[in-house]
Amino acid sequence: MSQVELLNQTLTLQRFPPMPEETPLQAWEAADEYLLQQVEQPSGPVLIFNDSFGALACALAEVRPVSVNDSFIAHQATRHNLRLNDIDDSLVTMQDSLSPLPDAPELVLMKIPKQLALLEQQLRALRKVVTPQTRIIAGAKARDIHTSTLTLFEKILGPTTTTLAWKKARLIHCAFSAPALADAPETLSWKLDGTPWTIHNHASVFSRTSLDIGARFFMQHLPEAVEGEMVDLGCGNGVIGLTLLAQNPQAKVRFVDESYMAVASSRLNVETNLPEAMERCEFQVNNALTGVEPESFHAVLCNPPFHQQHAITDHIAWQMFQDARRCLKWGGELRIVGNRHLDYFRKLKKIFGNCTTVATNNKFVVLKAVKLRKSR
């Protein structure tokens, strides 16, 4: 938690979920400051995109902006920091990236997302609502703005220029001119090898163009003949949960992710590939298993992320593991896949008191930890 001066306001900002105090990671970056230096008090609608921890929303709360993000955690972070600064969180409207945008914004401020596909989806959504009078400004670390980034802005919206770097950040200014543009499909689809399934992926889903190799390995080592409720935690496009449904015809599966597009992709993939299993499914956008009742599940399956936005961190994996233990029934298991170098074995042993290796190859390991009662 630390303070920053933004738009003549001293704001206290904290990363979310909260991290240890000794972390060097901050809840804002130079691109946030650089973007806000361009802002004169707007009188019309303001759209903010990809505001990871709410720095832009907190600074602009008085003009009642709409904050658009695919991340549920980013929305939670924004609410957290608004309250931390005694700002009424109802001043900022939170919206996911799949919902229609408000018409004719006066100002658009965008933090450029990590995935080029998500940037394209957001620019195409903006194209439907901006006008030639809309000020469109995007920002990021200078190293994250590439020729492909500028090409997308010009192709979808119109003439684009960049600024000089400031504190290693750079801005993009774009003027809307409605260039001719072919339609693009809402999802990218591909056949999943070894199955009859076609997998559909919204723009921000991890490994959107093919099955990632960790998930492919994990699919070979999932539990079978489970009759209770299981969770695909951090579900992405839902291929793990889809496999669980097929291998466990008596089980229910809850698909959970902090990405709105991931949960939408999971729902679409069950609807189109195993429609008869929809009654055994639940779909939830959440920060891990926050708010879920203890002792709810027979098994939790997880391919935990080891980064948040551009930062490498293991605190999300820790939260997933701890939430899983709380929400598992006694005798229930957490089964995960991870890169071998991440040492998840030690973490699970610390949380559960036990851990066994289910399978391993030269890059990944599948681990199992069981929620056991302490022996007296």
UniProtKB/Swiss-Prot annotation:
InterPro entries: DNA_methylase_N6_adenine_CS, rRNA_m2G-MeTrfase_RlmG, RsmC/RlmG, SAM-dependent_MTases_sf, Small_mtfrase_dom. Belongs to the methyltransferase superfamily. RlmG family. It catalyses: guanosine(1835) in 23S rRNA + S-adenosyl-L-methionine = N(2)-methylguanosine(1835) in 23S rRNA + S-adenosyl-L-homocysteine + H(+). The keyword Ligase does not apply. It comes from Cronobacter sakazakii (strain ATCC BAA-894). It is found in: Cytoplasm. This is Ribosomal RNA large subunit methyltransferase G. Specifically methylates the guanine in position 1835 (m2G1835) of 23S rRNA. Its main location: cytoplasm. Keywords: Cytoplasm, Methyltransferase, rRNA processing, S-adenosyl-L-methionine, Transferase. It is an enzyme of class 2 (transferase). GO terms for cellular component: cytoplasm. The keyword rRNA processing applies. NCBIfam families: PRK15001.1. GO terms for molecular function: 23S rRNA (guanine(1835)-N(2))-methyltransferase activity; nucleic acid binding. HAMAP family: 23SrRNA_methyltr_G. Its EC number is 2.1.1.174.
